[in-house]
């Protein structure tokens, strides 16, 4: 039965991934290579982006197609929303996988993808905004009955911190 469940799970994952005709990977290096290999196993064409310095990188060679998005400096390439979105539009990608770092925690990027009709493979912009701020994240967790460690929320005075420290210990 375990083998059956594994096959069923893999078929389900394949069907979910088939929702995408082409995935742009908004990253470089090992994470981009891993995403490209996973997409290849699922039969999904991939688009790599790269800076001028990364033109000969493995992820560029492995992808179905690749686009240079700017100079070596990350701020002018891998962190450039206009450059990444241009590559997505030109390539016809219908989804963008951010990998980690760079665009993976940029709520504004996820929102732009959504507005352009491109699926952001990751959390929604709203979820990123809520979880990006510790106070809001904690409040959201408490409101949804998720256990959290003892904490104070936002404190305004030294006295509040001292009172909490005496009450909870440290």
Enumerate the predicted regions with their spans.
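N-terminal beta-alpha lobe that positions the nucleotide/phosphoryl donor
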Residues: 15-170
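N-terminal amphipathic/hydrophobic targeting modules at extreme N-termini
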Residues: 1-11
